[in-house]
């Protein structure tokens, strides 16, 4: 049977496959046609990422179905909870109005001697 693989660039690849073929086999065929290594390929069908060991019939992929090819990200993304933690650590600070020292969020006086341990503090401006 014939299926289509659409890339992010909009290019459509036509593949000749069987319903018993595994996702690994499909990725190998894409590599043969496009030169993209299978470990960098992610195939999406009906909003689901296809797992390597499963077959096309497991996902109910029939003739003339369209799969979407997405390349795997090289780096990682920051998990939302880690992003919030990093933001709290880096952005929740007080700033001395005289010497611009970065101080803990609950500080009431500056720790530096050059400004005379002033109590003129402001919160650090948030990133946009």
From Swiss-Prot:
Q: Which CDD domains match?
A: Ubl_ubiquitin
Q: What region holds the Ubiquitin-like domain?
A: 14-89
Keyword field: Cytoplasm, Isopeptide bond, Nucleus, Ribonucleoprotein, Ribosomal protein, Ubl conjugation
Upper lineage: Eukaryota, Fungi, Dikarya, Ascomycota, Pezizomycotina
User: What more does the entry say?
Assistant: Ubiquitin is encoded by 3 different genes. Crp-79 is synthesized as a polyprotein with one copy of ubiquitin fused to ribosomal protein eL40. Crp-6/ubi-3 is a polyprotein with one copy of ubiquitin fused to ribosomal protein eS31. Ubi is a polyprotein containing 4 exact head to tail repeats of ubiquitin.
Similarity section: In the N-terminal section; belongs to the ubiquitin family. In the C-terminal section; belongs to the eukaryotic ribosomal protein eL40 family.
Q: What is this protein called?
A: Ubiquitin-ribosomal protein eL40 fusion protein
Question: Pfam families from the xrefs?
Answer: Ribosomal_L40e, ubiquitin
Q: Which domain of life is it from?
A: Eukaryota
Where is the crosslink of kind Glycyl lysine isopeptide (Gly-Lys) (interchain with K-? in acceptor proteins)? 76
Cross-referenced InterPro entries, in alphabetical order?
Answer: Ribosomal_eL40_dom, Ribosomal_eL40_sf, Ubiquitin-like_dom, Ubiquitin-like_domsf, Ubiquitin_CS, Ubiquitin_dom, Ubiquitin_ubiquitin-like
Any one biological process term the GO annotation gives? modification-dependent protein catabolic process
Q: Which GO terms describe its molecular function?
A: protein tag activity; structural constituent of ribosome; ubiquitin protein ligase binding
- Decide whether keyword Cytoplasm is in the record: yes
Glycyl lysine isopeptide (Lys-Gly) (interchain with G-Cter in ubiquitin) cross-link site? 6, 11, 27, 29, 33, 48, 63
Question: Which cellular component, as a GO term, is one annotated location?
Answer: nucleus
């Amino acid at each position: 049977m014939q299926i289509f693989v659409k890339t992010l660039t909009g290019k459509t690849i036509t593949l000749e496959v069987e319903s018993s073929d595994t996702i690994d086999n499909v990725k190998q065929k894409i590599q043969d046609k496009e030169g993209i290594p299978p470990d960098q390929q992610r195939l999406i069908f009906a909003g689901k990422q296809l797992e390597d060991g499963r077959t096309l019939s497991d996902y109910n992929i029939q003739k003339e179905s369209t799969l979407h090819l997405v390349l795997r990200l090289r780096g990682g993304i920051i998990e939302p909870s880690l992003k919030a933690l990093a933001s709290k650590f880096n952005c929740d600070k007080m700033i001395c109005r005289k010497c611009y020292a970065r101080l803990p969020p609950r500080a009431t006086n500056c720790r530096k001697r050059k400004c005379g341990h002033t109590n003129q503090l402001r919160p650090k401006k948030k990133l946009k």
